[in-house]
Amino acid sequence: MDLRPEEVSAIIKQQIDKYGNKSHVDDVGYVLQAGDGIARVYGLNNCMSGELLEFENGVFGMAMNLEEDNIGCVLFRGERDVKEGTLVKRTGKTVEVPVGKALIGRVIDPLGNPLDGKGEIETEKFRPIEYPAPSVMDRKPVNRPLQTGIMAIDAMVPIGRGQRELIIGDRQTGKTAIAVDTILNQKGKDVICIYVAIGQKASSVAEVINTLEEGGAMEYTVVVSSTASEMPTLQYIAPYAGCSIAEEFMYNDHKDVLIVYDDLSKHAVAYRAMSLLLRRPPGREAYPGDVFYLHSRLLERAAQLSDELGGGSITALPIIETQVGDVSAYIPTNVISITDGQIYLETELFYSGQRPAVNVGLSVSRVGGAAQIKAMKKVAGALRINLAQYRELAVFAQFGSDLDKVTKDKLIQGERLVESLKQSRRATMPVEDQVIVLYMATNKYLMDLPVKEVRSFNKEFVKFVNSNYPEIPNEIRATGDLSSETENMLKKAAEEFKDQYLRTKR
């Protein structure tokens, strides 16, 4: 074997040049105590609040309590693998979630892991789950409508892009149905939708996903799911993760985003469970003292951004479940005071057949009125007061049969207004069709019709206008207004159709 000293010395010199004596230092601690999804960690003196911690067996947790001699850490998964003495190291970063267009059409958990069996999510973008809300100067007033396709809401409790509108009511009153119908109605409107399921049954989440797929809504929707069987930690971070995904579309793609939190009552319960296990002092209803901040910092991230920042928006629809209609409980009053209005659903209305079961008296939209289209304002202006008068008179009418003509007329019209506002699930209506129906209802064209025929009459009238007078819906769609010329045309169409309808019924 022929040895070449010059080659050997060249290789040695090369190795010496490449050699670096950099040592990698990890901040490491160990577990003092573990159980119930909580680990007490000793030795991580420089740990940040909310920092992601990695345990030696690949389990991750989040630092929540920074105490004098230890850290209270909540675990995401794998609590059985964490025992006394398990090594823990800092990651130096807070909890992040993958974001970007790759998530559209996918079902993920709050950490960004896919749950739909469609393979890994290919994205290099990440955002922290906690992010500061836009300042006052970064925002502009809400001035564009977000149509839900539900007439009772679009007419009387209008929602604008960038608004936070609470959906509140007892269980089984159609809260999720309203949110899902609103997502379905965004088809073709260039709105990205995010549905965050917190503490729901897995079967309920699967049903929602199935509804969205059937309606073609998964093409523009991301589902973040943390079911009731998950650790409270994952339920706690789910809405923040969903909001970070929405912020990526709002800040960087300048898109309009709709996010549904279903529901924040279960979110507060998960946070309460975590806080009590961490030995934080309990307050009213055993919730910790910062439960208001829990929801306010989440909902303040919804905004209509200024034109300088691209003009994107996040519209939030948080859902709260009440117990026996008690809106004065702790969490409902908190969220009512944070949001820009609420849609209150009532059990009695639901079981009496009025669906959506919106209680018009208790529902309000504080900023959406500025975003409502002019045509809707014209036809629905007196709707709320007419319905309120009808409800009041209906109560008195139960006690006496001798009513004057004005009262009888108000009762007859009220019945037909209520009937016109009824809508089935997954039967959303374009705003121009809503204007046509409400014009008919508010201008007393339905007075001499039997109540049971009102809905079929309205449906036929919309078809009649769209086929015989297409310029009416076209103008409302294009301008958002109902000019006097168009109104005259609509009046003519209404009279023509009613004559035709009554002749066929005779």
Swiss-Prot record:
Q: Name one GO cellular component term.
A: proton-transporting ATP synthase complex
Q: Which residues are ATP-binding?
A: 169-176
| E.C. designation(s) | 7.1.2.2
Q: Which SUPFAM superfamilies match?
A: C-terminal domain of alpha and beta subunits of F1 ATP synthase (SSF47917), N-terminal domain of alpha and beta subunits of F1 ATP synthase (SSF50615), P-loop containing nucleoside triphosphate hydrolases (SSF52540)
GO MF: ADP binding; ATP binding; proton-transporting ATP synthase activity, rotational mechanism
For the keyword Ion transport, the answer is yes
Question: Topology with regard to the membrane?
Answer: Peripheral membrane protein
Statement: the UniProt record of this protein carries the keyword Membrane: yes
PROSITE patterns reported for this sequence = ATPASE_ALPHA_BETA
UniProt subcellular location:
Cell membrane
Show the disulfide pairing: none
Main location, first listed in the record: membrane
Keyword entries, A-Z: ATP synthesis, ATP-binding, Cell membrane, CF(1), Hydrogen ion transport, Ion transport, Membrane, Nucleotide-binding, Translocase, Transport
Marked site: Required for activity:
363
Q: Which residues cross the membrane?
A: none
Which EC class is the enzyme in?
Answer: translocase
Q: Which family does it belong to?
A: Belongs to the ATPase alpha/beta chains family.
Quaternary structure (record): F-type ATPases have 2 components, CF(1) - the catalytic core - and CF(0) - the membrane proton channel. CF(1) has five subunits: alpha(3), beta(3), gamma(1), delta(1), epsilon(1). CF(0) has three main subunits: a(1), b(2) and c(9-12). The alpha and beta chains form an alternating ring which encloses part of the gamma chain. CF(1) is attached to CF(0) by a central stalk formed by the gamma and epsilon chains, while a peripheral stalk is formed by the delta and b chains.
What's the protein name?
ATP synthase subunit alpha
Source organism lineage? Bacteria, Bacillati, Bacillota, Clostridia, Eubacteriales
